[in-house]
Amino acid sequence: YFNNFKIIKCADIKDKAAKKCASIYGIKSLSVNELLNDNEIEIILNLTIPKAHYEVAKKALLHNKHVYSEKPMAINLNHGKELLKLAKKKKLYIGNAPDTFLGGGNQKSKEILENNSIGKINLGNAIFAFPGIQSYHPNPEPWFAKKEGGPVIDMGPYYLTALVNLLGPAKEVIGSIMK
């Protein structure tokens, strides 16, 4: 529960989707351009598909809005760097998920490591398995598109962020995917 901000409006490139969201949450729906030009809006919560994150975030920054996106910030490194540079130039905040490392389990783990309760850690490992996005997601098709990244971009950042937060930058990474 976040009581320091209030979601008051929503937008989607599909008007029907924006109206559905607005109806569910009792907020006002706008077109994307209306939202970007609305002076009442201070921050954009960007929940688009990954390949659209860069474009939406850039437009929001250019319209003097702070941005918080789902992961990833951008599909390629140069676009990510460009967004960070633009936010800094305009004195705006930009952030993105995953913020799950701020949760209780990861914070307790960090406390244990910082107190040296279990000694030096030399290796981090993360394993994720599930029945597939199609088992629960209402629109799984973009997840399988070439530039969407699939499970690596969808779930990988949660585990990698936790490992980096707990253990520091990686010196070597090994990965595998099985169908």
PLM regions and their residue ranges:
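Glycine-rich, N-terminal phosphate-binding loop of Rossmann-like dinucleotide-binding domains
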Residues: 47-48, 128
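N-terminal Rossmann-like dinucleotide-binding module
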Residues: 1-25
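Structural detector of well-ordered beta-strand residues that form the stable sheet scaffold
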Residues: 30, 68, 93-95, 125, ...
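Alpha-helical elements of Rossmann-like donor-binding domains used by nucleotide-donor carbohydrate transfer enzymes
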Residues: 20, 34, 43, 55, ...
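Predominantly a Rossmann-like dinucleotide-binding segment in NAD(P)-dependent oxidoreductases
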Residues: 100-179
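Beta-strand-loop-alpha-helix segment that lines the small-molecule cofactor/substrate pocket
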Residues: 43, 49-50, 54-101, 116
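Conserved SAM-binding strand-loop segment of SAM-dependent methyltransferases
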Residues: 26-34
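Short active-site oxyanion
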Residues: 5-9, 42-44, 149-150
